[in-house]
A protein has these predicted regions:
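Terminal RNA-binding accessory module
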Residues: 1-76, 366
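Rossmann-like S-adenosyl-L-methionine
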Residues: 2-11, 16-19, 224-453
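Short, acidic/hydrophobic/Gly-rich beta-strand patch recurrent on exposed beta strands
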Residues: 23-28, 147-150, 214-216, 345
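Short, conserved phosphate/pyrophosphate- and ester-handling motifs at nucleotide-, phospho-/glycolipid
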Residues: 40, 165, 288
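Hydrophobic beta-strand signal
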Residues: 44-46, 133, 312
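Extended interfacial segments that mediate partner engagement and assembly in macromolecular machines
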Residues: 60-72, 79-187, 207, 222
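Short, solvent-exposed loop/turn elements at beta->coil junctions and helix N-caps
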Residues: 117-125, 190-191, 199, 203, ...
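Short, aliphatic-rich beta-strand segments
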Residues: 202, 209-218, 276-280, 380
Length: 453
């Protein structure tokens, strides 16, 4: 193999893309990963890091450009870590995400008879985020800055806009930056673990336009809070809720457990088709409302509900998918380990007049067995776990329960694939549909259908 050393300048042809969106050039089968390089491009690159099994390169020149390359519209793209794929056409992004899923389920796990559908994309893949979490800091001139983190760092890029956030959010961000400066509000400095204002969080109802503004502070005492609220209301008189969240931990967790309502309601309302949901500052609620409706409609299609089925909604959160399915089912049982989420789910069931739902707080694998003793046997199980996937004990419980169908939504196809291999003992993976919940990024969500063999 050719010698490869740091600072070498080399040329080559990109033969693949990684799941992180990096181009792959190979020298005698040795892979070099190069951010922002695209398949079939002939490039010049510099080696910046060499490891035992791979190297990292920096793109210097593109000698032959891919037909899928586009100009990134964001002026912060080269520095910001929020997006990874703005230089790739949207059609090619959707194809790349499908290839990721094919690679995981067919090439690696050998689910050769399982259908992988095309990625479900957006008509307009911008301005889709209904929740923004914006760090606050100071620059070297001691000026207030707000924006998002530089790639692979906690250095804040001072920004005036973000093209994947709701446009209202950037208006709020810019106004808040001015207010914090004018009122001389103390700003949290992560390295020193000192200061007050840590993050600004903004949530909007996609269909209702209700808006919640949350100030995350390092402690409860905030002398200027009344003045800040007054200025916010002057600038945004239609705001639904203003809250203070207290996070005095020294971790990377954005929000703490305690919140105080400074103005308006404790929650905002949003809708998904015919269902209405109450959302608090802490609620898990899908970031992309337009794509969530497509994702849930595909889940209902997979569930094949006729109105006679008992559905078990595990990892149910605030009840979104369970309540979405309730009009099509005989009864929906939801289970979630977070008490506040179950309270929200129960309230959302009342709001939607869903009398055929039951929501219980607890570990799914334990509650399922309790229900089994009570004679409750689901026909369909909905699974929507966090990124780490399902606990193995939960998978084993499902295998003993033997529902006719399992519909598995995942925000991490790698752990979904791992769980699919465990379910394969009794279940046939029929098909997987990727859904693009986060355009311009490498993230892909999937919904999969498993039928009992």
């Amino acid at each position: 193999m050719q010698a490869i050393a740091k600072n070498d300048i080399k040329t080559g042809t990109v033969v693949d893309l990684t799941h992180e969106g990096h181009g792959v050039v190979k020298i005698d089968r040795f892979p070099i990963f190069i951010p922002q390089a695209l398949i079939n491009e002939q490039i010049e690159y510099k080696i910046i890091k060499v490891k035992k099994n791979f190297a990292i390169g920096k793109l210097l020149n593109i000698n032959t450009r891919s037909e899928n390359r586009v100009a990134p519209p964001c002026i912060y793209y080269e520095r910001c870590g929020g997006c990874q794929l703005q230089h790739l056409s949207y059609e090619a992004q959707l194809e790349m995400k499908k290839e990721q899923v094919i690679n995981l389920f067919q090439r690696k796990a050998h689910f050769d008879n399982s259908k992988i559908n095309d990625t479900v994309g957006m008509t307009d893949p911008w301005r889709y985020r209904n929740k923004s979490q914006i760090p606050v800091g100071k620059n070297e001139q001691n000026e207030v800055i707000m924006g998002f983190y530089r790639q692979r760092s906690h250095d804040i890029i001072d920004m005036e806009s973000c093209l994947i956030q709701d446009s209202q959010h950037q208006e709020v961000m810019n106004e808040v930056k001015s207010i914090l400066k004018d009122l001389n509000v103390s700003i949290y400095q992560e390295q020193l673990k000192k200061g007050l204002m840590r993050h600004l969080v903004v949530r909007t109802g996609y269909h209702t336009d209700e808006m919640m503004i949350i100030f995350v502070t390092n402690g409860k005492k905030w002398p200027q809070k009344n003045a800040v609220v007054e200025k916010i209301l002057d600038a945004f008189p239609n705001v639904t809720s203003i809250k203070q969240n207290i996070n005095d931990s020294h971790s990377n967790v954005i929000m703490g457990r305690q919140s105080i309502t400074l103005y308006g309601k404790d929650t905002i309302i949003d809708q998904l088709t015919d269902s209405t949901f109450k959302i608090s500052d802490q609620s898990f609620y899908q970031i992309n409302s337009e794509q969530t409706e497509k994702l849930y409609n595909k889940a209902i299609e997979y569930a094949q509900l006729t109105g006679n089925e008992v559905v078990l909604d595990t990892y149910c959160g605030i009840g979104t998918i369970g309540l979405y399915m309730a009009p099509h089912a005989k009864h929906v049982y939801g289970v979630e380990v977070v008490p506040s989420a179950i309270e929200d789910a129960q309230q959302n069931a009342t709001i939607n007049q869903c009398n055929n739902t039951t929501f219980v707080c607890g570990k799914a694998e334990e509650v399922i067995l309790q229900w089994k003793v009570q004679g409750i046997k689901p026909d369909v199980v909905m699974v929507d776990p966090p990124r780490k996937g399902c606990d193995e004990t939960f998978i084993q419980t499902l295998l003993t329960l033997e529902p006719k169908r399992i519909v598995y939504i995942s925000c991490n196809p790698a752990t979904q694939q791992r769980d699919a291999l465990l379910l394969a003992e009794k279940y046939q993976l029929e098909e997987v549909t990727p859904v693009d919940m986060f355009p311009q990024t490498t993230h892909v969500e999937t919904v999969a259908l498993f039928n009992l063999k």
